[in-house]
Amino acid sequence: MGKGMKIEKKTLSMKSVAKKTRGKVRVSDIKTSSQVNLRVAISQMNSIVGDFKHNLNRIENCLKEAARFEADLILFPELALTGYPPEDLLLKEDFIEKNLKTLKHLASGVTGIVAIVGYVAKVKTNLYNSAALLYKGKVVGNYRKMILPNYGVFDEKRYFMEGHESICFSVNGITIGLTICEDIWDANGPGKKICTEAQADILVNISASPYFKGRGKTREDMIRERARKYKAHLVYTNLVGGQDELVFDGHSLVVDPDGTIVTKGNSFKE
């Protein structure tokens, strides 16, 4: 992450509510220091690599449920649209085009809520592990993952280019920053810049973090520490299910700036 990294800012106007509800999507009301409530829905979903019809159907169902609960914002995991890890499917032009076509179709149906969805962005010949910001039927923003893991089971640098610009958006006057998976594991990564320079109230991290023994506790401790360090609410969503040798355990979290866990998703269950 270079010193010249820019932060893109967007303002979205939404009506906020404070009704307590719960369903297939986990819903949490976050009250910021400005005493404004934001209702956030978290979709801890089981994406299937390459099955765009299945993934789109799961996302659309969660959007309908979040709308029923009058959520302001809904989060989907890293590469929720394509499944993770797509690996050499990323080398197929048809796969990339289906991913982009599915995103456009998905965006057209997003109304009355802000949605963040993981997908693959393409710029000329370069691919980016990205998160799309969907609002009022359009893709209104895009964040490209800045820190790409290339160790153990991860081989992202083979397929993706690194992003160089952070993004913040505002809902009901609440500033929200966006990161993807590995971005949050680096204490001095993009999350720090978003929270210190853009003064984000909430930092979002969409993830595809595989399970191994002790990983849930390590991840939870890290997220709580980042919330304390950045002095921001941290909302984290993770995939569930399995793909090849990888198993994803979910364990999504909402954490207050003091490191207190507000709500926690189930393990190994949507």
Regions found by a protein language model. Give the residues of each.
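Enzyme catalytic cores with a strong preference for nitrogen-chemistry domains
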Residues: 2-270
